[in-house]
């Protein structure tokens, strides 16, 4: 299943196993009637992993090559050169280094990016500088010029992309959310963009989907 209507799974008397076809299980566990005695597993799909790699690489390149500035110059018919920094000049931090996070880290390392990873518990990954827990989070954020969120959505990670996190990033950092909409405090992101703490954001998910037509994120230039 992907996102069954609330109450559906509880109504299935012969239910013995639930397999989530998405990257996480939070969308299923949000159903208060979900039968907690039924095993819940998630599917690891090579196609899903490849799709996430491509999205994260695309978003990272857009941010580090400052394509938002180039698009603005084009729209205004302004010939303006921008400083080009190679991948080796950037520090990319990935929050969440499970299956998807590790795959994306490997792809970015192959392109020359300096990759760091943060998780709740200690992990070791070849070529990745890893941090863990609350104690490691601040140092991780302080060094992340590009912050990529691939965390699962849990009570502990709800709203983790908010003012406190943005204020710990380097001035002018980029934020990429490919996790869940619930990770992002959208009002805090807009404020961080407006004051330049965050230079640019790439969002794959939102708290409300489809994003309402009147939402200010539609019109924000960055």
Identify the function of each model-found stretch.
Residues 7-13, 28-35, 108, 120-129, ...:
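Short loop/helix-cap segments at secondary-structure boundaries that form the rim of catalytic
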Residues 1-71:
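Phosphate/diphosphate ligand-binding glycine-rich loop within oxidoreductases
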Residues 12-16, 35-38, 113, 171-173, ...:
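A short helix->loop->beta-strand "cap" motif at the edges of active sites that frequently abuts
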Residues 105, 109, 193-194:
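Gly/Ala-rich phosphate-binding loop of Rossmann-like dinucleotide-binding domains
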Residues 70-103, 130:
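Glycine-rich NAD(P)-binding loop of Rossmann-like domains
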Residues 122-216:
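Rossmann-like adenosine-cofactor binding region
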Residues 37, 88-92, 163, 172:
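Phosphate-coordination loops involved in phosphoryl transfer and adenosine-cofactor binding
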Residues 91, 113-114:
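Residues at the starts of beta-strands that form the adenosine-phosphate
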């Amino acid at each position: 299943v992907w996102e069954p209507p609330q109450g559906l799974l509880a109504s299935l008397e012969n239910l013995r196993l639930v397999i989530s076809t998405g990257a996480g299980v939070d969308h299923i566990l949000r159903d208060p009637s979900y039968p907690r005695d039924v095993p819940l597993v998630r599917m690891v799909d090579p196609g899903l992993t490849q799709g996430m790699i491509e999205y994260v690489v695309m978003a990272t390149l857009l941010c580090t090559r400052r394509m938002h500035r180039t698009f603005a110059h084009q729209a205004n018919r302004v010939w303006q050169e921008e400083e080009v920094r190679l991948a080796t000049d950037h520090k990319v931090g990935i929050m969440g280094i499970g299956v998807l996070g590790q795959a994306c880290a490997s792809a970015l390392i192959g392109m020359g990016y300096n990759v760091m990873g943060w998780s709740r518990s200690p992990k070791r990954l070849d070529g990745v500088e890893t941090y863990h827990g609350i104690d490691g989070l601040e140092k991780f954020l302080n060094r992340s010029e590009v912050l990529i969120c691939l965390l699962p959505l849990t009570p502990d990670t709800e709203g983790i992309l908010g003012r406190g996190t943005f204020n710990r990033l380097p001035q002018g950092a980029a934020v990429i959310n490919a996790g869940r909409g619930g990770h992002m405090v959208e009002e805090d992101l807009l404020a961080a963009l407006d004051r330049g703490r965050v230079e640019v954001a790439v969002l794959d998910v939102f708290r409300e989907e489809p994003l309402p037509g009147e939402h200010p994120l539609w019109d924000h230039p960055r």
